[in-house]
């Protein structure tokens, strides 16, 4: 490994994540050179490449394996997903993240003409026998832990799509209306999906109320509607009213 590679890795590991522009300035080289260096280091497994930068592979990940999450609060998640099915209409383009609640949405979806964009292998499998549902897979780097695809290839596709609405979950919402995720790769992809969508719907069970995690995903004001199994705490309900966010129980 040459000196510049060591310098890049040291900076990314110290900061947890870094943008291409930030690294170019730190190393005093061009953005194009940094991109090539990051791709090389990512191919060696020394860091994780994201759109516009990189994330340290030493960064703590608070997320759980999909098969574990799938069985936590399963009744509540199924109830929430069933309610959210009212969003569906023919020929809609729908974004689904790799959360277990989104999997219930995919599993329960009727076989109507529509398009689903997802990075989740479990969503793909849930939709495979629904002949009227066209599935677009983001591609990217596969995570065995999350059984989903992430990284710049996934995010690049999302930037080129127009999605009517996205359905996703998170690790928690704090009392100030911040949405939290367990790791940067999940957070980064969900941000891109939200940006590509006309409307964003958050499916979250009540165990995640007033909880934080590792990475701040977005502000709750970016959400159009929250689907949950119980009423929101008073402070969050007040926040939703102030920002015209609907809640569906």
UniProtKB/Swiss-Prot annotation:
Superkingdom to which the source organism belongs: Bacteria
DNA-binding region: 18-37
Matches recorded under SMART domains: DeoRC, HTH_DEOR
InterPro entries noted in UniProt: Carb_Metab_HTH_regulators, DeoR-like_C, DeoR_HTH, NagB/RpiA_transferase-like, Tscrpt_reg_HTH_DeoR_CS, WH-like_DNA-bd_sf, WH_DNA-bd_sf
Keywords, alphabetical: Activator, Carbohydrate metabolism, DNA-binding, Fucose metabolism, Transcription, Transcription regulation
Pfam families: DeoRC, HTH_DeoR
HTH deoR-type domain boundaries: 1-56
Gene Ontology molecular function: cis-regulatory region sequence-specific DNA binding; ligand-modulated transcription factor activity
Biological processes, Gene Ontology terms: fucose metabolic process; regulation of DNA-templated transcription
Cited PROSITE patterns: HTH_DEOR_1 (PS00894), HTH_DEOR_2 (PS51000)
Function: Transcriptional activator of the fuc operon.
Protein name stated in the entry: L-fucose operon activator
Native source species: Haemophilus influenzae (strain ATCC 51907 / DSM 11121 / KW20 / Rd)
Organism taxonomic ancestry: Bacteria, Pseudomonadati, Pseudomonadota, Gammaproteobacteria, Pasteurellales
């Amino acid at each position: 490994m040459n000196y510049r590679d060591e310098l890049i890795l040291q900076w990314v590991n110290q900061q947890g994540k870094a943008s291409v522009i930030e690294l170019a300035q730190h190393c005093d080289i061009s953005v194009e050179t940094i991109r090539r260096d990051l791709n090389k280091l990512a191919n060696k497994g020394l860091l994780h490449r994201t759109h516009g930068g990189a994330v340290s592979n030493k960064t703590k990940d608070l997320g759980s394996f999909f098969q574990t999450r799938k069985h936590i609060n399963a009744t509540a998640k199924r109830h929430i997903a069933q309610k959210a099915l009212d969003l569906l209409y023919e020929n809609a383009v729908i974004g689904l993240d790799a959360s277990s609640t989104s999997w219930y949405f995919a599993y329960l979806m009727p076989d109507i003409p529509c398009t689903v964009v997802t990075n989740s292998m479990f969503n793909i499998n849930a939709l495979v026998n629904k002949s009227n549902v066209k599935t677009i897979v983001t591609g990217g780097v596969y995570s065995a832990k999350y059984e989903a695809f992430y990284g710049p290839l996934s995010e690049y596709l999302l930037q080129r799509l127009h999605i009517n609405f996205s359905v996703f979950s998170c690790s928690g919402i704090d009392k100030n209306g911040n949405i939290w995720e367990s790791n940067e790769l999940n957070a980064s992809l969900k941000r891109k999906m939200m940006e590509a969508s006309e409307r964003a719907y958050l499916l979250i069970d009540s165990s995640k109320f007033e909880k934080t995690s590792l990475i701040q995903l977005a502000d709750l004001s970016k959400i159009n509607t929250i689907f949950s199994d119980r009423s929101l705490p008073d402070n969050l309900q007040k926040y939703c009213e102030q920002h015209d966010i609907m809640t569906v129980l």
